Amino acid sequence: MLNVELSGGKTLLQADAFKKPNMIDEARMETYLSAVRKERKNLAENVYKDEILELMGITSDGVPTLAGLMVFSKYPQGYFPQLCITAVSLPGTEMGIVGYDDERFIDSKRITGAIPDMLEDAVSFVRKNSRIKTIIDDNGHRADKPEYPVKAVREAILNALVHRDYSIHTENVPVRIEMYRDRMEIINSGGLYGKISIDALGKVRPETRNAALANMLELLNITENRYSGIPTMRNEFAKAGLPAPIFSAVHGEFKVIMKNGLYSDEEPADESVVEFCSTPRTRAEIVDFIGKSKNYVMSKIVNPLVKGGKLRMTIPDKPKSPNQRFVKA
C-alpha cells in the first residue's frame, strides 16, 4: 500500500514500484542529468547520480518525492489517480447547457501522464476543440487565426500544473480545462501562494510553491522559471486583439479566464456559413464545409445561428429529421 508522509516540507512516496526501471522515463531522466552536468557544473563534478537526485529534490533518502514522481514516472496516476487534467468542451456558455443532440459535452478527456506529457496533450485538446478564423488579406493571402493564442494557452496550462497545490488536502483535485462557447477557463487548486495579490501578478516576483518541481522543468527546457508566464499570456492576447486574460483566486482555487472574442453576431466564420446556406444544405454538407466534427458544428455554429434567426430549418417541426436542411433566413 502507498504510504504518504510529510518530511521537511516534502511529500515522500513509500512506493518501491517507482524504483523499478520500467516505471521511470529513462530518456527524460538522461536528458535531465545531461542538462544538470551542462548547466550546473559545480554540482555535477565528482557527484554521483544518486547524490544529484537527492540534491535536486527528485529523491529524499533514496525515496522519490512527489515532484520527482510527477516529472519522471511514466504514469504518476498509478499512485495519485486525480493528479491529472480533466478537459471538456461544452456547447454553451454555462455548464449544463446541452447541445443540438442533447449532448452535455462536445468532447471530454481525462489527461494523464507525467507533467511534460500532460502539458502537450492538454494543448492538443485545446487545439482540437478550437475554432479557426480564416483571414484573407488585401493581396489574397490566406491566414488562419486560432480561437486562442497557442503560446498563451500553453503558459496557462503549464502554470496550473507547476503552481497548483500538491498537498495531501488537494491530491484528489485535478486541474480543470473548461472550454465554453465564449471563453475557456483553466482552474487549479491552491489559490495564490505567499503574499502576492491578483493585481501584482506579472509585475512582481512571487514566491514559488513548488520550487523543486519548477527547477526540474527548467532543466528539461519546459519552463523558463523566470516568472514570465503571465506577462506572456497578456502579450499574446494583446497581439491577437483579444481581451486580456482574467485571473482570480477564490475558495482555494486559481482560475484563468480567456475570452475568445469570436462569437459576436458579426462573426465572419458564422457569416460564411450563412452565405454557404444560401442554397439549402444538409448537416453533412455544412460539416464538410467547416471541417470540424458534427457535434461541434451543430452545437457551436448551426444551432446558435438558427436560434439567432440567421438560418432556418426546411422542416422546422422535425428538427432532427435526416432530411433536414438549413437555409439562409
Identify the meaning behind each predicted range:
Residues M1-E171, I177-R181, Y193-K195, D199-P206, ...:
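Active-site helix-to-loop segments that bind/position phosphate- or nucleotide-bearing substrates
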Residues M70, E285-I290:
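A short acidic, leucine-rich amphipathic alpha-helix
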Residues E147-Y148, K292-K307, K320:
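Short amphipathic alpha-helical interaction segments
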Residues M184-N221, S264-E266:
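Glycine-rich/acidic phosphate-handling loop/turn and adjacent ATP-lid/helix
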Residues P243-P245, V306-D317:
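A short, conserved structural fragment
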Residues G261-F276, K307, D317-S321:
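Short alpha-helical segments that sit at the start of domains
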Residues S278-R283:
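Short capping segments at the starts of secondary-structure elements
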Residues M313-A329:
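Short, cationic-aromatic polyanion-contact patches
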